[in-house]
Regions:
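Solvent-exposed loop and edge beta-strand segments that line ligand/cofactor-binding
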Residues: 2-23, 56-73, 80, 110-127, ...
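Well-ordered alpha-helical scaffold segments within catalytic/enzyme domains
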Residues: 18-32, 73-85, 127-142, 189-204, ...
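Generic alpha-helical secondary structure signal
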Residues: 34, 38, 42, 86, ...
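Long hydrophobic alpha-helices with heptad-repeat/coiled-coil character
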Residues: 39-43, 47, 51-62, 139-169
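Generic beta-strand structural signal
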Residues: 52, 99, 159, 220-221
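Aromatic-rich carbohydrate-recognition surfaces in CAZymes
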Residues: 65-162, 188
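Catalytic cores of carbohydrate-active enzymes
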Residues: 102-108, 162-173, 180-246
């Protein structure tokens, strides 16, 4: 059984173009690696500045020059603490303009401005984007209609409307790109984050009838640790035991 159906398979072209670009970039950096001078703080500041390309914060300085929704969501609060509010807002405007133009929110935007999902539609793309918008106080009014359409699409695509949980029968892209899991704890934590962030925002919130802290504890907590997914296999997964506390 394929981890995702033919109907949800993303286009092949972005894989080919991005794969070739990353391969060439990786080869170049092995031959001519860039070295930074200074102490740890100075080096980190230089890397952050190199990740700002004038249009958006790219994920890394070399191989991953794309915009990644998840990675940016992880970094948004820290970037704000480091006084990069202007660049954060410009990155969000860049991403939202391209998402709106292509009628979808995705995991990734190529350096050429084309959104695509790797490897398929991800549960955490919309939650991390909304989180970045909220914590940065980005003025999203002009994108409200588009965001509400994406929230509605997310709810119908991802959520079992009887349980409130991520549909276990569908494989979605996630923090572990190719891992096949059944409604993972991490994915449901992302839905919980989305439900929480939508409160107080002038956006639709179809999740407000569910109590996600209670659902996650009931379905994943075994008294000692959180299960990785609804399969309840007896191993401890790092993401499953980090994000419930985030």
């Amino acid at each position: 059984k394929l981890p995702f159906s033919r109907t949800t398979m993303p286009p092949v072209l972005p894989y080919l173009t991005e794969g070739s670009r990353i391969f060439l970039s990786s080869w170049k950096n092995r031959v001519l690696p860039k070295k930074y001078e200074g102490n740890a703080t100075q080096i980190c500041n230089q890397i952050i500045n190199d990740c700002w390309n004038g249009r958006y914060f790219q994920t890394s300085t070399t191989n991953f020059t794309q915009f990644w929704t998840r990675d940016f969501g992880w970094c948004t609060k820290s970037l704000l603490t480091l006084k990069y509010e202007k660049e954060v807002h410009q990155t969000l405007r860049y991403a939202l303009n391209h998402f709106k133009e292509h009628h979808k929110i995705s995991t990734t935007i190529t350096p050429g401005g084309k959104p695509f999902d790797f490897p398929t539609y991800a549960v955490d793309s919309l939650p991390w984007l909304i989180h970045s918008i909220k914590v940065s106080k980005f003025p999203y009014y002009s994108f409200r209609d588009f965001l509400n359409k994406e929230i509605k699409k997310f709810y119908s695509t991802v959520i079992n409307q009887h349980t409130g949980l991520v549909k276990p029968e569908i494989h979605f892209s996630s923090i572990k790109d190719f891992a096949v899991r059944k409604s993972s704890c991490y994915d449901n934590c992302m839905v919980a984050l989305l439900a929480k962030d939508l409160k107080g925002m002038k956006l639709d919130n179809p999740f407000e009838t569910f109590s996600y802290p209670e659902l996650i504890k009931r379905h994943f907590w075994n008294g000692e640790y959180f299960y990785d997914d609804l399969g309840h296999q007896k191993y401890v997964a790092g993401d499953a035991n980090l994000f419930p506390f985030a």
